[in-house]
Swiss-Prot record:
Pathway recorded for this protein: Cofactor biosynthesis; coenzyme A biosynthesis; CoA from (R)-pantothenate: step 5/5
HAMAP family per the UniProt record, alphabetical: Dephospho_CoA_kinase
Protein name: Dephospho-CoA kinase
Gene name for this UniProt entry: coaE
A GO term from the CC aspect: cytoplasm
Superkingdom of the source species: Bacteria
EC number(s) reported in the record: 2.7.1.24
Reactions catalysed according to its record: 3'-dephospho-CoA + ATP = ADP + CoA + H(+)
Length: 211
């Protein structure tokens, strides 16, 4: 039985293919944790608090943070936050500690299952202390134009919003490296089979596969 279960971080900018890589890792016996899913849960749980924090700024931009059913309008929240870095920072200071606590609980449960590795699919991993807990990090990369196409295909948002989001994510790789994380860049520009070979090569090199 494996005595040490490595923690693998998966990061990258919007549209790079983090979820595809996570699925590949799951197929290879890894336990995958989706930080975005946890974040969405918290957005619903703390929706009233978030609306209270940002409703004035949202109204000034003609945005409503409430859906018709009364829930938090996460798409409008994203438009607001990515248009103003200070608001994004305030939101992250409020939410990220809560996300991190949930992820720590998820990691503890995953360790009990003794998988080949635990995968933390977390775009903002570099903004939490969990980055230092990772054995290594996969930074998923794709050209901006390809990422733009992927995002437009799956989301009903404007090009302006996507450009602002992309701009806010510029420092992901540099911040990971700055914290001395053992980071591998994985290009995702073609077929899934090619991406899978790259992932397998890294997993084999790190001893996750081939035992």
């Amino acid at each position: 039985m494996r005595e040490f279960c490595p923690l693998i971080g998966v990061i990258g900018r919007s549209g790079a293919g983090k979820n595809v890589v996570s699925r590949l890792l799951a197929e290879r016996g890894c336990y995958c944790i989706d930080a975005d899913a946890r974040t969405r849960e918290l957005l619903e749980s703390y929706g009233d608090s978030i609306v209270e924090r940002f409703q004035v700024a949202a109204a000034a931009r003609g945005l409503s943070l409430r859906r018709k059913d009364g829930g938090l309008h996460s798409a409008h929240l994203g438009v607001l936050l990515f248009s103003e870095p200070k608001l994004l920072q305030q939101h992250e200071e409020f939410l990220l500690p809560k996300v991190t606590r949930l992820l720590c609980e998820d990691i503890a449960r995953a360790q009990a299952a003794r998988p080949k590795a635990i995968v933390l699919n977390a775009p903002t991993l570099h903004k939490t202390e969990l980055l230092q807990a990772c054995s290594f990090v996969l930074y998923i990369w794709a050209p901006s134009i390809l990422r733009m196409w992927r995002c437009k295909k799956r989301e009903r948002v404007s090009f302006t919003h996507l450009l602002r989001r992309f701009s806010a994510q510029k420092g992901f790789y540099a911040q990971s490296i700055a914290q001395n994380a053992d980071t591998y860049t994985v290009a995702n520009c073609g077929r899934v089979a090619s991406l899978a070979r790259k992932v397998d090569c890294i997993l084999t090199r790190r001893g996750v596969l081939g035992e």
